């Protein structure tokens, strides 16, 4: 998997939806602007900074086993973007917190497990708490199929390649003054 940060908010000039340069360990104009807003100490400025804060995303290659909404995706390797909750579920499988739990790499073609995404709305927000892993098993007994899946993976490096970041953009929101 790879991880990246982005910003997504509506400003006076329209929507700003871009990956954050902090992903590349570089200064990001929106993050710097948010810091300036926050440091004024004004609650109105802090509210603006909160609305513009960076968001964390993860991306992995996944084989779509079942997709009732879009059956044309079944059998294809897709890039799957997800948030902290699903990442924590993956991490808990790979690095269990308790001694009686066996570590498992869900991405392993022979000893991994399908991840069943179960989405529901809780208090107006999408919730993935009911998602779960199936019993670990080989993806297939057919080496040709395993090789085809392996060769169908997308480049994760491209997701966070420098050309995917618009470093020249600087968003400035009007700041309430004291």
Report each predicted region and the residues it spans.
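Extended serine/threonine-enriched, polar tracts that run as long, contiguous segments within proteins
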Residues: 79-147
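Accessory, usually C-terminal, subdomains that scaffold auxiliary metal cofactors
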Residues: 150-170
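OB-fold ssDNA-binding interfaces and closely related basic DNA-contact patches used
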Residues: 1-105
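Conserved small/polar residues in nucleotide/adenosyl-binding loops
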Residues: 171-178
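Short linear sequence elements within intrinsically disordered, low-complexity coil regions
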Residues: 9-10, 133, 138, 170
């Amino acid at each position: 998997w790879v991880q990246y940060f982005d910003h997504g908010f509506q400003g006076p000039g329209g929507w700003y939806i871009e990956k954050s340069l902090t992903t590349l360990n570089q200064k990001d104009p929106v993050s710097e602007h948010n810091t300036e807003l926050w440091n004024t100490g004004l609650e109105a400025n802090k509210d603006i900074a909160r609305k513009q804060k960076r968001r964390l995303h993860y991306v992995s290659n996944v084989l779509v086993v079942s997709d009732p909404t879009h059956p044309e995706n079944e059998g294809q390797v897709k890039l799957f973007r997800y948030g902290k909750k699903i990442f924590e579920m993956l991490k808990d499988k790979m690095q269990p917190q308790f001694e009686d739990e066996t570590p498992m790499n869900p991405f392993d073609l022979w000893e991994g497990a399908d991840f069943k995404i179960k989405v529901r709305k809780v208090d107006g927000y999408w919730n993935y708490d009911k998602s779960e892993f199936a019993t670990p098993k080989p993806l297939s007994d057919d080496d040709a199929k395993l090789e085809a899946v392996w060769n169908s993976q997308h480049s994760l490096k491209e997701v966070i390649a420098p050309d995917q970041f618009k470093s020249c953009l600087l968003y400035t929101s009007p700041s309430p003054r004291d």
